[in-house]
Amino acid sequence: MSRRVQMKRVVVAVIATSLFLSPSAFAEANGKSVKSAKIPAIKCATTKAVGHTPPSVAPAEKVLRRIPRTFTFATNCGNIVVTTVGAKAPITITQLATLARGGYFNDSLCHRLTTKGLYVLQCGDPTATGGGGPNFTYRDENLPAEGLYNYPAGTVAMANSGPGVNGAGTNGSQFFLVFADTTLGANYTIWGTITQGLDIVKAIAKAGVKGGGVDGTPNQPISIKRVTVSNS
């Protein structure tokens, strides 16, 4: 099947439900404490980012001829660089690059931190509600095998709200950064690996969740100021 035909399967829809699965759906994979781990200190600038309505960005109609190699997320806590999986997830990377180049992620908060059962920082929702996304969705790609720690530390994967109608997918803009080896159902497209800045994500995790829980808004606010997409 050609890439052009695959891209025509992009579904126009607004995701109205909270993305990703509850940590209660998973047993804790290991007994490691994020707070007890030795993590380098980081310095975060104050962010003025708040939940907001993002700009409208139209979906790409076909896969990019050159799949971007890196996404650099400039945050108030430093740069997080993600090296993509390239041709293993061409639709996902193309749509994320389209959103990034359209300013969709600019000044958006990473709205959710989970520190028990699964170990992720979730970003990509400018509304900061967990239910935001662009006006289109697309199918899953590059799903891992089922098994222990199938989303290892450094993995970057898409959040979603299920497989969608006839497997059309519910991927949009939200993604999660894995800061410690995590076991999940093999339902989330892996599109990259953190090659710079994992220490930033770990430090955010070490600072914990507001209210002292294990799933919610990070104590230390972290916002994406802008995203630079590169082919080199």
Question: Positions of the model-derived regions?
Answer:
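Cyclophilin-like peptidyl-prolyl cis-trans isomerases
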Residues: 2-4, 8-9, 20-232
